[in-house]
């Protein structure tokens, strides 16, 4: 398996016995049955373009972006690749997608092989998933405020700061560009939940000093 970057999925596949080649020249992808595209979101189009001349008919290609379905892999599919998507959500749950039945069977097998539970999702469900994951990530702001209150009262709590603030699992760091954040905001159908989300985004920007990248200011 050729992987564009090291990731949770490539590590898990290596754990169950797959030979993984990470961060190798793109030309080497042609020698692998499975190509895993797990680059940060802004770099995915460039990786796909670089891979296009090297992809062969029947080769499996999988990306790990939450915000994109398999359509982003169209340039590789037209060259005969079996295209799939899988993203880790929480615990053993992975959301998946594929362009055809072979892809569905393959991605289900890969995720099941690492002990995961594959959950097929449609593209229109992805903004809701992104909103849920972003809200989980923003929980950090609440935990940090709570920790700062406790630190003034409980001596020695600093040694437990990491566990208190982050918990057992850190949600994926999703892109924070204006379009992505507006997609996430629009996914909150419940006005109260949207207001909570906006408040947490505002709290994060106050703490980090980062201006909001779009026209809608939280």
Named regions from a protein language model:
Residues 26-91:
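Rossmann-like NAD(P)(H) cofactor-binding subdomain of soluble oxidoreductases
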Residues 1-30, 150:
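NAD(P)+-binding Rossmann beta1-loop-alpha1 motif at the extreme N-terminus of oxidoreductases
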Residues 152-218:
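Interdomain hinge/lid region at the active-site interface
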Residues 1-5, 38-41, 64-66, 97-101, ...:
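Structural motif
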Residues 23-25, 86, 121-123:
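Conserved beta-strand termini and adjacent loop/short-helix elements that scaffold enzyme active sites
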Residues 8-12, 16, 76-79, 91-172:
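Internal alpha-helical scaffold of NAD(P)-dependent oxidoreductase catalytic cores
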Residues 20, 35-37, 107:
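Hydrophobic beta-strand residues in large extracellular and virion-surface proteins
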Residues 19-21, 83, 118:
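Hydrophobic anchor at the start of a short beta-strand
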